Amino acid sequence: MSLSIGLLSYRSHPYSGGQGIYVKHLSRALVQLGHKVDIISGPPYPELSQGVNLIKIPSLNIFEEEDRLRSFKKSYFISPLDLFEWLSVMSGGFPEPYTFGVRVREYLKKSLSNYDIIHDNQSLCYSLLDLQKEIPLVTTIHHPITRDHKLELESTNNWKQ
């Protein structure tokens, strides 16, 4: 039986961090087994094998900015979610799982019927919990994301970063 799988990853760097590499190899194996796979990811986006579709969920991607303080744009005032994401990062928070969850839920409201199952790869966002009422939801937890956040904070040279 062939399945249509939505594989979620809030951040999928293609060369480091693990999530982008994990979803690349998992999606390739699932396609080889005959399944249809969409990677639904926030930036940075993964490099994927042939036959795997990428659905890009935009975000501010502030963690990639050299000067996060100066990355602010007036347009953030238009979107409460963008403003929350920027303010949270600037105060030492790690909002990406939450903000990805809100954004991906909006995408899935329109596209849920395209999938037989959703596989959440580490995003652990609250907004996905109600999906279980409508579609099977599987979650993979690799390790606590608080470890990533702690390492990020420890590696900064000054408060601007």
Which positions does each model-derived feature cover?
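A conserved catalytic-core segment of Leloir-type glycosyltransferases
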Residues: S2, I40-R103, L108
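Short, basic, glycine/proline-bearing loop/turn elements
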Residues: S12-H13, M90-G93, R147
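Active-site proximal beta-strand in glycosyltransferases
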Residues: I5, I117-H119, L131-L151
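Nucleotide-sugar donor phosphate/pyrophosphate-binding loop at the beta->alpha transition
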Residues: E96-R103, R147-Q161
